[in-house]
Amino acid sequence: MTIIPPGSTIGILGGGQLGRMIAVAAAQLGYRTHIFAPEDSGPAADVSPNWTHGAYEDAAALSAFADSVDVVTYEFENIDPSAVDTLARHGLVRPGAQALRVAQDRLAEKRFVCDLGGLTAPFAPVESLDDLESAVETIGSRAILKTNRMGYDGKGQARLAEPGDAVGAWNAIGRQSAILEGFVTFAEEFSVILVRGADGAVRFWDSPANVHVDGILSTSTAPAGSLIEGQVEQARALAKQVADALDYVGVLTLEFFASADGPVFNEMAPRVHNSGHWTIEGAVTSQFENHVRAICGLPLGETGLAAPRVEMRNLIGDDVAAWADILRDPANHLHLYGKHE
C-alpha cells in the first residue's frame, strides 16, 4: 500500500467549498494542496495558494498538474472520467474513475445498485417522448423524470402527477436522455457516510436524518430517530458492497429513503458530502480529515459522535446574514466559505 506522508502535495479537482474543506483538513495534517479548476478562483483559493486554471478536457494541463502533486482527489462528480484516466497515467487518483462512471449516470447507478441486491424506486430509461409515455404506463404517473446526467440539488428534474404531464416534463428537462423513477412512499430521508481506506478498512459515521427544502439539503441531524436506526444496518451493508465493488478509497455517501419496505437507495456521491458537514465538530474525526487519511494511505480516525446530539443547518442565500445571531449560542460552530451564489 502506497503511503503519502505529511509534507506531500494533494491535488484537488475543483475549487469550491468541498475542495476548501478538504484543503483545511489536509493542512491540519501537514499536507500542501494544489487546486485544478476551470474557474480562476473560488472558495478553496482562500486556503490553498496553489491554483491551476485549466479545463478538465485539457490533457496537457492535467498531465502537468498530476506531475506536480503526489495524489489527486476530486470534490464533485461531474468530471469526465477520461480526465481522471489521464491523471491516473501519471500517478495516484483516489477515488478512481469507475466511481465517477457509475455515480454520474443515474441509470448506470441504479442498475449497479440493483445488481448488488439493493432496493431502488422502480425506474425506466427514457430517450424519447414515446419512451416516457411507455414508462408512465409501466411505472405509473406519480413519478419523477430526471436527466441522466448533471442533475443536483433538484435541478434537471420534473414531477409527474398524471399521464398528461409527460409532454410538459419531457420539455422541462430539455428533451434529453433521462430516467423515470416511480414515486417512493417514505417517512424520512437519511444518508450512510463511510470512509474506505486503501487497505480496504471501512468506518461509518452515524447516519443523519436529512431534511430537504426545494431539493436542497436544509438540515442533517444525528443520531437519527428509531425508524432510521432500524434500517441503518441494512443500508450500511449495501454501502459497503458498493465501496468494495468499486475498490473505493476515500469518503463515499449513499442517500436513502426510510420506507415501510426498508431502506430505498436514492443516489450516491463519490466524495465528501454536505450531509456529513456536521462531522467537523460533531464527530471524533471529520469526513474531510478521514478522506485525506484514506487517500494518503494513513490509518483511519474514529468516527463516533463527539456530542450526544448534533445538527447541521445549511445556510442558503440570505441565511448567512444571521451569522451574529448564530454565534450568540456558544454551542454553535459557524462555517462560512465565501460562496457568492
Where are these regions (language model features)?
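Protein kinase-like catalytic core scaffold
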Residues: 203, 263-267
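Active-site "cap" helix and flanking loop/linker of ATP-utilizing ligase/carboxylase catalytic domains
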Residues: 233-254, 259, 269-320
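Short amphipathic beta-strand starts and helix->beta connectors
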Residues: 34-36, 140, 296-299, 328-341
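Active-site nucleotide/adenylate-binding loops and adjacent lid/helix of ATP-dependent enzymes
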Residues: 102-191, 195-242
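ATP-binding N-terminal substructure of ATP-dependent carboxylate-amine bond-forming enzymes
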Residues: 1-111, 115, 130
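Glycine-rich active-site loop/lid that clamps phosphate-bearing ligands
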Residues: 306-309, 313-341
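Short, low-complexity Ser/Thr-rich regulatory SLiMs
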Residues: 194-198, 256-260, 338
